[in-house]
Amino acid sequence: MAKNNSTPQKLVITGIKGYQRFISPLLGSNCRFTPSCSAYATEAINRFGVIKGGWLASKRILRCHPLNDGGEDPVPPIKKSK
């Protein structure tokens, strides 16, 4: 659905890539999930667009804390309309 890579999408993805390249190495690998939260955010935004993908990524980041065991948590598939 949102695979057209609009300008807002490109800006957000560029910000995430910047985080992955420059900030994440300084913080170390702390994500409790697979894929990492930043990889999840990139995939969700590419799949669903900035609004819905950003919402999914925000919910995921809020779950990434020491009280959560983490584990495998892929981006949900696009639901096909009937």
Swiss-Prot record:
Keyword Cell inner membrane annotated: yes
NCBIfam families: membrane protein insertion efficiency factor YidD
GO cellular component, one term: plasma membrane
Listed PANTHER family: MEMBRANE PROTEIN INSERTION EFFICIENCY FACTOR-RELATED (PTHR33383:SF1)
Superkingdom as given in the UniProt entry: Bacteria
Taxonomic lineage of the native organism: Bacteria, Pseudomonadati, Pseudomonadota, Gammaproteobacteria, Alteromonadales
Name of the protein in question: Putative membrane protein insertion efficiency factor
Subcellular location: Cell inner membrane
Keyword hit for Signal: no
Species of origin: Colwellia psychrerythraea (strain 34H / ATCC BAA-681) (Vibrio psychroerythus)
Membrane topology note: Peripheral membrane protein
Main location: membrane
Alphabetical UniProt keywords: Cell inner membrane, Cell membrane, Membrane
Purpose of the protein: Could be involved in insertion of integral membrane proteins into the membrane.
Family according to the record: Belongs to the UPF0161 family.
